[in-house]
Amino acid sequence: MLGYWNKSVYITYFGAFIACFGFMLSFALNNIDYSFAGMIIAAVCDMFDGKVARHLKRSENEKSFGVEIDSLADIVCFIALPALTLYHFGMTNYYQIAILSLYVVCGIIRLAYFNVAMSDKDKAISYYQGLPVPMSILIFSLVWILNKKINFDISLVYTIVVPIVGLLHISKIKIKKYTDTWFYILVCLLAVVGIFLLFLL
């Protein structure tokens, strides 16, 4: 088969599969919760694939493939799918479509920039420059969960939040990157709680 196969890319493949599966299931069942749940799982996978990759002995081709497949998966899971999900479930006015398009452009600019600037994913970093694209899913999901509890004008809130998140993707703000084990455990627990809240509220 084409491609490269190791533990790190298995995680990337699984995340992309789950995100796409949840997205299509949300359309089939007309329930946005499945799309957000799939993208949350993909975000957790994205958090771990680089960590696993740094502990593997890989050829230069495998390293390059890992960088490219991770970037392509990010485009699908955290840029295209969120925009299409929010469009399908309410952001359909012309200015909202423009906002979603802006979000997509900001996301691909960010990923292309870091593909050039940081082509070696084995290199550990202490901070992020700008908001990483997987974090957008956590923000969008949190807004949706709060809407279930408070019941505000969700379309209006996303109209404000989406462009802010998009611009944060290409901003130069520095966000500390936590790498200790307890942080990863906490993020996984929060992801599980978030998915449960999506379906319970």
Identify the meaning behind each predicted range:
Residues 9-13, 55-111:
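Multi-pass membrane catalytic core of lipid/isoprenoid biosynthesis enzymes
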